[in-house]
């Protein structure tokens, strides 16, 4: 009896120490789901896969004309989602969604996407599956809720000009690639940073932010007129590609794909500069993201900067809140462990 009590206590302690904040891969397959309505809660970083054996050529119940048109054009999840009754592009509604892929095998349609590590506001949307059940085509609903993780926009550059400003999660967003070629951000240690490119561009260098561009001549003076010129051109001859470990003396964990990339800056005390770009598929256009870590000189000396009033230079308040939560969790975890051990101790007497 005593031995089983000790084993039970160890299992509980293990769960307390390991079950917090785990990223999950979640699957919803309507071939095996019995109910017609499936709620699914996600958090930043989760990966979800959805499968539906579509039957669209039969008599379909509960489908209005608008839905029928979208489904005839195969505008399925997760490329497209329903927010209320409105068909919406996932990458616009959940900014920074990445690895959005789908495949078809016969009538089975399977799609997957990764929730970005930064979600500014709660997101709610539906996926509709029309499938045959008992010789009748019925409508089944996957209702997804994504919990938010931060309270303020993060330092970053989003060059998707056609997306709604209301769904933006970065300090610079909805910038037209035709008019704006450069975006400068000034994060601090601990901040998330992000670069998001249009669908006909891709992020360079490969593996950004693990690999970055740095100036070949870092002490070269930047001309005053260039500093505020948002149309200044990218000149690859002035940069080298290096590992971020070379720049920061430590690695950074990145998440994303060739269109959207995220990273959380480590604890860096020094002033550090680096660059990543969005390059058009024909390699004729480049959109620059310049990152200036722990650099406040531009703010104090150059308040004339275009867009500086829009730019929120740090989301440190967010991390102060998160750190307090983590400290609180750590304390409660140790308290729980202490109580369990005391319980086991007195149980043995």
UniProtKB/Swiss-Prot annotation:
A lipid is attached at residue 315 (GPI-anchor amidated asparagine). It is a lipid-anchor; GPI-anchor. Residues 22-149, 153-301 form the 6-Cys domain. Residues 1-21 form the signal peptide. PROSITE patterns: 6_CYS. Disulfide bonds join 77-127, 157-183, 197-278, 208-276. Residues 316-349 form a propeptide. It comes from the Eukaryota. It is found in: Cell surface; Cell membrane. InterPro entries: 6_CYS_dom, 6_CYS_dom_sf, Parasite_Repro/Invasion_Surf. The keyword Transmembrane does not apply. Keywords: Cell membrane, Disulfide bond, Glycoprotein, GPI-anchor, Lipoprotein, Malaria, Membrane, Repeat, Signal. Glycans are attached at residues 294-295, 301. PANTHER family: ANCHORED PROTEIN, PUTATIVE (AFU_ORTHOLOGUE AFUA_4G09600)-RELATED, PTHR38796. This is Merozoite surface protein P38. It comes from Plasmodium falciparum (isolate 3D7).
